[in-house]
């Protein structure tokens, strides 16, 4: 029990000391400096005025902010139990690597004479672009699919914005985004290791992806703040500014259906959801139908589950009473898609929890996947049984019996 408490406290403190996390102390200090500098340049505000706006008690100790702090504490405990049971990106990367071996009947070696830094640059850029595009797709789905909105709504009920608002998420949304990161990283790692081998490296600064480091150090934490900073009409067509994300959090639903991107604005431009920042910030943040219990922690965790069940149930009952057999409305379609997404997430979670052993068939040389196997075993504690050789399929069937997917 004592070890669990120490581990929990370590997880709570880690985001402030880890450059891979948004609220790393260095990024928070950088955000203050950016806010002071740009506020003076763009609007002539003094350092004292900007600091007063940044650290106003009415923002940092509001009901909304206090709920954020509670959610951080609760979600951390929840995710400590869930994350080790999710499918590993190393396992998925290994599966993809082996699958590509079969597709290509061997492993090509692309650009054998290319400098290592070129391969590292291409890999880092590809991973960043894929990750950012996936964030846009998932974020837009959370808004467009009513079932998923039941959970994402928790984030948008924030009426005051602080850097900790980024963690104001329901655990179901947390699992969805965790799986998104796992799949995207596994895709990039598997493909690049297949084509470029051990030349695949990530360009980092202080251990963080170089692109995300620059994003965070240049004021990413101001996205969830009351400091209005616009990049101008030209730059905002390429990068999402803090002001654009604050527009996304506006209480006006027309604003909330825009600027779904995380870093790059190109996805919103392609999807028709880009909105440039205007001269004035939104009048208020949150959602229009906020209730007195909006910032109650029990309500934050329970209400989305109730609403999700209702979201699934109501279209079905309406269909029986009113709709012809062949008529499905758009809301039902979206809820069905959302249900499938949730089913996949829970299925992956359930499979990971139930799997004490992982059985892998490989007709390739052991050294090709052994590093992935060892890393996966060290990270998850899962025992891995690997069958090598051409007759491995028969051995696999014999070992796994009737439960074998083969």
Residue ranges and their predicted role:
Residues 1-19:
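Short, strongly hydrophobic alpha-helical membrane anchors
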Residues 206, 281-322:
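A membrane-cytosol interface segment of integral membrane proteins
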Residues 355-406:
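Early extracytoplasmic/lumenal segment of secretory-pathway proteins
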Residues 326-340:
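Bacterial N-terminal signal peptides that target proteins for export
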Residues 23-105, 123-135:
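Specific transmembrane helices
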Residues 338-349:
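Bacterial N-terminal signal peptides
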Residues 65, 72, 262-270, 301-315:
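A transmembrane-helix-recognition feature enriched in membrane-embedded lipid enzymes
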Residues 74-88, 92, 96-97, 105, ...:
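Membrane-embedded catalytic scaffold of the fatty acid hydroxylase/desaturase
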């Amino acid at each position: 029990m004592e070890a669990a408490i120490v581990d929990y406290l370590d997880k709570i403190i880690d985001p402030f000391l880890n450059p891979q996390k948004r609220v790393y102390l260095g990024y928070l200090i950088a955000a203050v400096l950016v806010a002071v500098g740009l506020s003076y340049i763009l609007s002539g505000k003094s350092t004292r005025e900007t600091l007063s706006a940044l650290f106003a008690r009415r923002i940092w100790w509001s009901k909304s902010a206090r709920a954020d702090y509670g959610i951080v504490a609760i979600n951390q405990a929840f995710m400590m139990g869930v994350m080790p049971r999710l499918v590993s990106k190393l396992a998925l990367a290994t599966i993809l690597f082996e699958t590509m071996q079969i597709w290509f009947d061997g492993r090509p070696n692309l650009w054998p004479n290319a400098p290592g830094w070129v391969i590292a640059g291409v890999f880092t850029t590809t991973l960043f672009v894929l990750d950012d595009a996936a964030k846009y797709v998932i974020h837009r789905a959370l808004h467009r699919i009513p079932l998923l909105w039941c959970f994402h709504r928790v984030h948008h009920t924030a009426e005051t914005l602080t850097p900790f608002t980024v963690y104001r998420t329901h655990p179901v949304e947390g699992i969805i985004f965790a799986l998104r990161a796992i799949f995207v990283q596994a895709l990039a790692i598997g493909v690049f290791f297949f084509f470029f081998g051990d030349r695949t490296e990530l360009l980092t600064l202080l251990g963080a992806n170089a692109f995300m480091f620059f994003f965070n150090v240049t004021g990413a934490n101001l996205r969830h703040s009351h400091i209005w900073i616009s990049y101008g009409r030209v730059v905002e067509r390429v990068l999402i500014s803090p002001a654009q994300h604050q527009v996304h959090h506006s209480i006006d639903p027309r604003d909330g259906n825009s600027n779904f991107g995380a870093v790059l604005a190109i996805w919103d431009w392609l999807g028709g959801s880009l909105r440039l920042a205007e001269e004035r910030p939104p009048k208020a943040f949150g959602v229009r139908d906020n209730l007195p219990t909006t910032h109650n922690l029990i309500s934050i965790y329970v209400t989305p589950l109730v609403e999700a069940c209702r979201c699934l149930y109501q279209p079905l009952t309406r269909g029986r009473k009113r709709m012809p057999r062949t008529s499905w409305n758009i809301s039902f379609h979206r809820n069905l898609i959302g249900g499938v997404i949730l089913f996949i997430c829970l299925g992956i979670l359930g499979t990971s929890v139930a799997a004490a052993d992982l059985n892998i068939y490989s007709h390739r040389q052991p050294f090709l996947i052994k590093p992935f196997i060892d890393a996966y075993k060290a990270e998850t504690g899962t025992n891995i049984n690997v069958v090598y050789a051409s007759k491995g399929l028969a051995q696999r069937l014999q070992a796994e019996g009737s439960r074998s997917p083969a």
